[in-house]
Amino acid sequence: MEFLAGEYDVAVVGAGHAGCEAALAAARLGVKTVVFAINLDSIANMPCNPNIGGTAKGHLVREIDALGGEMGKNADKTFIQSKILNSAKGPAVYSLRAQVDRRSYQIEMKNTLEKQENLDVKQAEIVEILYDEVEGKKTVRGVKTHTGAIYKSKVVILATGTYLKGKIIIGDVSYSGGPDGLFPANKLSDSLREMGIELMRFKTGTPARVNRRSIDFSKMEEQPGDERIVPFSFENEEIKKEQVSCYLTYTNSETHRIIRENLHRSGLFGGLIEGIGPRYCPSIEDKVVRFSDKESHQVFVEPMGLNTQEMYLQGMSTSLPEDVQIEMLRTIPGLENVSIMRNAYAIEYDCINPTQLKLSLELRDVEGLFTAGQINGTSGYEEAAAQGIIAGINAARKIKGLEPLILDRSQAYIGVLIDDIVTKGTNEPYRMMTSRAEYRLLLRQDNADLRLTPIGYEVGLISEERYRKFEEKRRLIEQEIERVKKTNIAPTEKVNEFLKKHNSTPIKSGVKLADLLRRPELDYDTLAEIDENRPDLSFAVREQVSISIKYEGYIKRQMQQVEQFKKLEERKLDKDINYDEIKGLRLEARQKLNKIKPESVGQASRISGVSPADISVLLVYLEQRKRQKS
């Protein structure tokens, strides 16, 4: 029997990484919010790898934090190992990655949700989106649970992860299920289809979890964390804690032989899996087939937490049967006597075609319905959380009658992510990578606060105290850059001895300290030896000063490119344009433009199938329209 159980401004369906950020953002912006989870013990669950961050993903976490989100703070509280990846490369691709204690992460995030003002946390399966339809225009009015409870709401955010019609595949066995042995959400997909929303079918997978006591670590390479810990959250200046090690081992020809001989029994190759899997996180059988010339593949053995013997085998995701999993794992050095605690499996699930969304993450054809995370065809906790905070902010802004927050490609990786999926769509689980960002030298993880904290403050998620500290940091950076550029270094014996020691050419006449800093073999901290008036500054400030001066030429060039990009982004396109009526546009361009309804000429130019010639026609049309109006 149906009954009215409550009324809210925002209802968030799902409490994974997208749902948590969405619910917290909306509630913190002062709107009455409820978040639903199929099981409250699965809030902020990590059904796959027990880590936060990584290449490009670390950028997303720092951007979420700079806007006022929770993921970075929670990772800082619960990590057990921290590392900067790509440190041998340039600063554009430095990426922070932390191994976290999976259960501690969940407990901390659950507690954060439970204590949040304006937020109720409820265990229930949502089976239907309730909506009104007037003259073909749909508007959400709430959600219904499996027990018939109706919750009225002005906005609904779907953050359903991999639960929609979830199907687990292990070899030739398949059954209806969600991740980690939880129930799937089988009815909500039908509700979305009835609303006319286009769904797709994707697949992802996870490796086995094995017992630490059955591993011989002496046959593996130890992978310790970094000595100096860089926090995810800009609110944390320094963290000191004991870290645990991960371990590296490799597959071999025997492992690959067993996999090849059993390919017909894999869900992926045996035909049981219909969904499209992630290109950049392939299963081990996929890797063995696609990279047949490779003699070995890396396997990282990672702890799931401090109070468990479970270890995660990164690189060994598979849908092979249980008996084959045991056989192949026992060919790997250090895993000869391994005991599997949880089998590897593949999971298939429904998601929406994200080209149905506006850049605000609201569906174009359903007023008040937002989506975030894996339901939008993305993969990864960080990608989900990034969409979650934007959906939560924009849900609250919609209720307050404010314009949505839209970050563009020159402002944030979050902007690149959302623009990519909304404008281009995706035919496989989308993963964030540094190569997707055209302006990656400007979108570094170290300057996420300089880029986005003023926006977070303006939106209302950054406190006065935090913003005051941020402005002080910005002042110190600007002041020190100016000092370094003005400081003269004379060609003294001490200076030239220092330069020789660091394999740098001695100077014959006075130079600015900034000129020495631009030399590739010298860095800001090293130069302290000959920089007598240097102030005592935090690592975060020193890093900004160093990068800003060392890469100044490249940064200026990229800023000029951004100016060109902005010109097309500022040419807005009305929603009511009928592209069929614009003479000169090719048929494919008309069809794509009418379907996606881009918000600017810049966005239109990135749609697959819209050529530079089509953009020229569009610009001429806009000029004609402008003249007619004036």
Swiss-Prot record:
Keyword presence, Nucleotide-binding: no
Annotated positions binding NAD(+): 277-291
Binding annotation for FAD: G14, A15, G16, H17, A18, G19
Annotated keywords: Cytoplasm, FAD, Flavoprotein, NAD, tRNA processing
Subcellular location: Cytoplasm
GO-annotated biological processes: tRNA methylation; tRNA wobble uridine modification
A single GO molecular function term of this UniProt record: flavin adenine dinucleotide binding
Cofactors: FAD
Function: NAD-binding protein involved in the addition of a carboxymethylaminomethyl (cmnm) group at the wobble position (U34) of certain tRNAs, forming tRNA-cmnm(5)s(2)U34.
Homology family: Belongs to the MnmG family.
Protein name as catalogued: tRNA uridine 5-carboxymethylaminomethyl modification enzyme MnmG
Source organism of the structure: Acetivibrio thermocellus (strain ATCC 27405 / DSM 1237 / JCM 9322 / NBRC 103400 / NCIMB 10682 / NRRL B-4536 / VPI 7372) (Clostridium thermocellum)
